Amino acid sequence: MSTVDLIRHVKLSTARLPLTVPISDAKVFTGRQKPMTEVVFLFAEITTEQGHSGIGFSYSKRAGGPAQYAHAKEVAEGIIGEDPNDIGKIYTKLLWAGASVGRSGVATQALAAIDIALYDLKAKRAGLPLAKLLGSYRDSVQTYNTSGGFLNATLDEVKARATQSIEEGIGGIKIKVGLPDSKEDLRRVAGIREHIGPDVPLMVDANQQWDRATALRMGRQLEEFNLIWIEEPLDAYDFEGHAHLAQALDTPIATGEMLASVAEHKGLI
């Protein structure tokens, strides 16, 4: 009698989370996107023949939510009967099932919910937190508020949010930059640095909206604020520009979150 547990069912669902206040980053000020008013989630729940289950999710902002759900729905049935331990094999199977629409972007974002659900299932069945299942090293990590200051918020509002984050034990603050007036960006960064002091980690995020010349100029002007990193100063696919910028500045450059495939990350690295 076989003891191999197989996938019996994949349940997909979607939900919209409306934001209390629309939020804006630099893409709004360049006219490339509208303010974000909601986040759309894709949930995947995988159940096995022996009754084990795992839950995963992915999400989209501004656009793509219905497409993620549709893509996942179209390919998910293909993993029924597979061994849930074969996570890499299953991911490759799903990737090729929808390869005609590409192996990045919406396609891989849709698969993320299923992939995460498989890892969740494996950890639950082992009776371990996922971190330990993967081979844990630390028992704590330093956190930061990635939404510390969108551009629709006033400087006073950003300061208040920073104070709240620090009081709650969050170890760093990231704020948005990329306003049409770069002097206003610098004023806001200076105001936050003065408010939180020199020792609290501070980062900025331009959301891909600077060109190379602007990124270099702003990067040099921002160095006095001892930033942990400057995030997405350039278009995510400008790999060469990021490399030149990283060599020219003392402040580290962070990027990569908009890349959704192994090939794209290989190109960046």
Predicted segments with their positions:
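Conserved, mostly hydrophobic/aromatic
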Residues: 7, 51, 75, 114, ...
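Metal- or metallocofactor-binding catalytic centers and their adjacent structured scaffolds
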Residues: 9, 47-125
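Flexible, glycine/charged-enriched surface loops at secondary-structure junctions
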Residues: 87, 130-133, 229-236
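Active-site mouth loops of central-metabolism enzymes
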Residues: 141-157, 177, 206-211, 254
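Catalytic domains of carbohydrate-active enzymes, especially glycoside hydrolases
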Residues: 164-176
